[in-house]
Regions:
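Double-stranded beta-helix
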Residues: 118-186
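Residue-level recognition of conserved beta-strand positions in structured domain cores
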Residues: 55-57, 70, 89-91, 119, ...
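Glycine- and acidic-residue-biased ligand/ion/polar-headgroup-sensing regions
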Residues: 73-86, 90
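Conserved metal-binding segment of the jelly-roll/cupin
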Residues: 100-121, 131-133
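Short histidine-centered beta-strand/loop micro-motifs
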Residues: 44-46, 66-72, 89, 98-99, ...
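Short acidic-glycine-tyrosine-enriched beta hairpin
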Residues: 48, 52, 91-111
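A short, N-terminal "cap"/entry segment at the start of jelly-roll beta-barrel domains
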Residues: 1-53, 155, 159-186
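Structural motif
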Residues: 84-86, 114, 123
């Protein structure tokens, strides 16, 4: 059984707020949020790691490419445990890369690099880790999306109100790039 905590972020959380304390979370019982068609589950964040890294999963159905974005101060990794995810990345010189990642594959996105992804198979899962000098961005998902106690992807997509795109991302080291074009062909 996973213990519940009240935090400044959520009324009910399975993640303790104090850094330096061991804890355990059962599968899927982290802090969950729905955003678009995906479910994000945070297992460790800035509160537990003194803002050095976060650890989360993203589960979703086959769908559209998420909006291109970058993180000025955050490095991000994509490790695929189930399904297939197409990762798009542009390096700092402007060269674009595209790679279909399947179970066991890994992708690394340096800070400041525009990137996006598209889930290519239903029931895909990404394990994400992000770290950088500016802190961590795991609370972005529940602030742009909606916190949930559900254990599955949303029945209907959750699309944030337009005004949230103007305020929430900057608080969490996320810069959306609405005019960005991928030239890789997919």
């Amino acid at each position: 059984m996973t213990i519940e905590f009240a935090t400044r972020y959520r009324e009910r959380s399975h993640i303790p707020t104090e850094p330096g304390k061991p804890y355990f979370i059962e599968k899927g019982m982290g802090d969950r949020a729905h955003l678009f068609t995906d479910m994000f589950t945070v297992y460790a964040g800035g509160e537990q790691t003194e803002n050095t890294f976060n650890f989360f999963t993203c589960e979703g159905p086959k769908g559209d490419v998420i909006p291109a974005h970058s993180h000025p101060d955050t490095y991000e990794v994509f490790y695929i445990t189930d399904g297939a995810v197409r990762l798009f990345v542009e390096d700092l010189e402007g060269e674009q890369y595209e790679k279909l990642l399947t179970a066991g594959d890994f992708g690394f996105v340096p800070k400041n690099c525009p990137h996006a992804y598209r889930i290519e198979r239903h029931h895909s899962r990404i394990v994400g880790v992000a770290a950088g000098p500016g802190g961590t961005f795991e609370r972005f998902f529940e602030n742009l999306g909606i916190p949930t106690d559900e254990l599955a992807v949303p029945q209907r997509p959750y699309v944030p109100e337009p005004h949230k795109f103007a305020t929430v991302p900057q608080q969490y080291d996320v810069n959306f790039l609405p005019d960005h074009k991928w030239r890789t062909g997919n």
